[in-house]
Amino acid sequence: MRLCGFEAGLDKPLFLIAGPCVIESEELALETAGYLKEMCSQLNIPFIYKSSFDKANRSSISSYRGPGFEKGLSILEKVKSQIGVPVLTDVHEDTPLFEVSSVVDVLQTPAFLCRQTNFIQKVAAMNKPVNIKKGQFLAPWEMKHVIAKAKAQGNEQIMACERGVSFGYNNLVSDMRSLVIMRETGCPVVYDATHSVQLPGGNNGVSGGQREFIPALARAAVAVGISGLFMETHPDPDKALSDGPNSWPLDKMKQLLESLKAADEVYKKYSTDF
């Protein structure tokens, strides 16, 4: 699949979608995007910047949701024009899709909305690349039906994203078999290594997380075989306004990506999956 100027697929080099969970400020967005662009250029990893202008599914009414549509979209436009990177953001049922599509390069649908047929089809009808997150409640083989709804709009630029599955209350686990199963859709499969260590709503009205397990799960996913890696990162995760406990420190990204790139190259050299 052609994606933001590069080829994405199981037999292609690993690409990265990364950035802070939510837009906190223009300064932070430009800083992180610039840092990640330079890092990925050095490592020769295709890169898409991500951040959200509105986190509509925060656990608490008092949690920070973002700068809002107009200001957030303006910041994403500056990231794209000033830093020179493609950008991804998530959209919701009440998002003005035409306005967002005029700025961003990739649309993302939240995991909680993956079963909303009208929503999935409206997003796919924008004819932009779409990263569809698999719901925490959904079996991997059910994603073929979600993908079919999107592709019924004539859009073949669809990705399937694994972000963990509910395991009891306030806990997620990653079943690596799901990556293999979702590849059967024919779409590039993306692994979200940061939300997969989230402890949803498990910290007194806010989500906790176990970021120490991010490297292990990311390496496992790359070894199984994926097209892209999704990671939320922040210069100071403990002070992040959203999803800090499951965000990876920005200054540790390069070391981790170096190991993942090496693992990806080994998998794609010796794999019999394609």
From Swiss-Prot:
InterPro entries cross-referenced by the UniProt entry: Aldolase_TIM (IPR013785), DAHP1/KDSA (IPR006218), KDO8P_synthase (IPR006269)
First-tier enzyme category under EC: transferase
GO cellular component terms, A-Z: cytoplasm
Catalyses which reaction(s): D-arabinose 5-phosphate + phosphoenolpyruvate + H2O = 3-deoxy-alpha-D-manno-2-octulosonate-8-phosphate + phosphate
Domain of life of the native organism: Bacteria
GO biological process: keto-3-deoxy-D-manno-octulosonic acid biosynthetic process
Subcellular location: Cytoplasm
Pathway where it operates: Carbohydrate biosynthesis; 3-deoxy-D-manno-octulosonate biosynthesis; 3-deoxy-D-manno-octulosonate from D-ribulose 5-phosphate: step 2/3; Bacterial outer membrane biogenesis; lipopolysaccharide biosynthesis
Gene Ontology molecular functions: 3-deoxy-8-phosphooctulonate synthase activity
EC number: 2.5.1.55
Cystine residue pairs: none
Keyword Electron transport part of the UniProt annotation: no
Keyword field: Cytoplasm, Lipopolysaccharide biosynthesis, Transferase
NCBIfam families (alphabetical): KDO8P_synth, PRK05198.1
HAMAP family xrefs: KDO8P_synth
PANTHER family: PHOSPHO-2-DEHYDRO-3-DEOXYHEPTONATE ALDOLASE
Family affiliation: Belongs to the KdsA family.
The protein's name in its UniProt record: 2-dehydro-3-deoxyphosphooctonate aldolase
Organism: Legionella pneumophila subsp. pneumophila (strain Philadelphia 1 / ATCC 33152 / DSM 7513)
